[in-house]
Amino acid sequence: MPVRHIHTVLFFFCVIQFTQTLFADTPPDGNATIRRKAGNSEIVITTTNRLAGAIHSLTWNGKEFIDSFDHGRQLQSAASFDCSLPGEFWAERYNPTEAGSRSDGAGPTASSKLLSLRAAGNELQTTTRMAFWLAPGQNSSGRPALNEKILSDHLISKHVRIGFQNHDNIIEYKTTFTVPPGEQHTYAQFEALTGYMPAEFDTFWTFQPETGQLKPIDDGPGEQQLPVILSTKDGKYAMGVYSPEQPSPGFEHAGYGRFRFPAAKVVKWNCVFRVRNKQGIPAGEYPYRMFVAVGTREDVRQALVALVKKF
């Protein structure tokens, strides 16, 4: 068979396989656990069917780090797009979300669809077809949803590994967003990773790469350019995020966010990337690499020092 015919056959085989995966009727089991020793304890990460394979729990040294209440408060990923509309951008109006939709509430099922999951030892890989956060006809702060269906054609894949080089308390976290063809956008906002944490993680810090020290920061809300750490007051428990790929071109003063929601009794950090293209956001894959450090506040500081030296 001529080479060009082989390439054509392989291309159509891949398209067929992707389509079969996207529209598979029976999802894989989303209940999984990975773990690895870290210090005198171990980091344990748990996913659930309820959240279409998103991370429901992360524990270390007897402490839960994730506030998994509805289908938005997890360790998870989401994306937002402008639908090429002028004027104000409001993220939740077109907002594919890994763990499910707002309407899923605290219920037992997700509108998102888990397509694949592999978990072994300290390593987890998943692919999920994301639901829109808003259902058609719903609104966010008076701004109506732009999507016309609840289940999007956007995919999120993650590859999570507990431990990085000689650092047991660093979690390497890779995400790949797949933007489908046929959509028209000029602005994309990828919340590559966010962590919703219990309210007791109530002190916020930035990591200063030049000195390796931490500096207190107010609760914003919003983003700035330095890695963030959320900690308990006594410093015994903390979580921080760092990405060597920050900042996004043209958005040098953003990337790491921190938020406090007193009424909901939850706090949040995120790591956000942005793409703006007046000619249109191309369909395809958008990969990002991040590192999440867990432990005492000092453990997390030392982990970020090591990461900055590495990258």
Identify the meaning behind each predicted range.
Residues 192-195, 200-261:
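Active-site/ligand-binding surface loops and adjacent short beta/alpha elements
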Residues 146-157:
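Amphipathic hydrophobic-ligand
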Residues 51, 59, 167-210:
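Acidic (Asp/Glu-rich), glycine- and aromatic
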Residues 25-41, 46-48, 237-311:
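Beta-strand-rich recognition/accessory modules
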Residues 130-132, 160-164, 177-181, 292-296:
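Beta-strand elements of well-folded, non-transmembrane domains
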Residues 1-10:
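Bacterial N-terminal signal peptides that target proteins for export
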Residues 37-141, 146:
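Acidic-aromatic substrate-binding/catalytic surfaces of carbohydrate-active enzymes
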Residues 9-19:
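Bacterial N-terminal signal peptides
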